[in-house]
Amino acid sequence: MNKRSKKKDLKEKAKKETVEWVKALIYAVVAVVIIRLFVFQTMMVPTESMFPTIVPKDRLFVETITYQAREPEHGEIVVFWTPFVDKEAQKMLRPFDHFMNAFSPKEFDGHVMYVKRLVGQPGDEIELVRTEGNNGYSVLVNGETPDKLAGIEYSKAGIFTDPQFYRKMAYPDEYPGLSAQQEKFFEYYNSALDYRSAYKRVYDSMAVSEYAWYDEERDHVKLKVPDNCYFFMGDNSNHSFDSRYFGFVPEKNIVGGPLLIFWPFNHFGTVNSDLPADTEEP
């Protein structure tokens, strides 16, 4: 075999290997897309709202099939699309996140995924009560604390301080008596989130008293979860932006349950929905 023929054979071999690698890459991408569309979602957790079960920068595999067959239960950790466009959280997403989110429903463009613990199902009445010996508050759902929520202390904030909280957050200019701290809070979240649009979709068709009211006898605010909606809170209550602030989450926004932490490797493992021994800040 002469040099020219040998060189030609090497080129042909390299060409075939390149084609095989390209085909393998295409098959891998197709497989990822199919799995993403029908079985799994992925997300990166940016905050410490679910510490210590899930910590900032954990990346999760989210299983999306279970909640197509049944309703999520009290105390389960659930991943859902925010009811609002979240401009600030969008800035924290990496190219991989944008690629995976590209296969999500168009109605959630600009939204991000949150992971929290489910506290209220449709029709549930929810209240926070001070219990003896605790610094925080325990949650009552229809008069009782669900077993999977019994070990968590919550801070009384947001809607639990004022039945008008959601409306004030959407229309702060209608409430001239707000404190400087409230004005700053509402101003920030109305610029970071498209909250007013989300409020209109969920609440404009109902009176505030249908979902939040002050119970004179109990001396605190009580909530009732509207039909086709859920109420979520983070375990690390003082560091969680959750339904206390932004309101109820429509059923259609639920993505699934976190199954596995796949990154970083030193956190690799399944996500345990059981209550952690400690929910304090690290």
List the model feature ranges, each with a label.
Residues 2-19, 55-282:
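Soluble "head" domains of membrane/secretory-pathway proteins
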Residues 10-14, 30, 43:
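Enrichment for repetitive, rod-forming helical segments
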Residues 23-40:
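Hydrophobic membrane-insertion alpha-helices, especially the h-region
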Residues 29-32, 48-49, 65-68:
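Intrinsically disordered, low-complexity boundary segments flanking structured domains
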Residues 41-58:
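Alpha-helical transmembrane signal-anchor/signal-peptide segments
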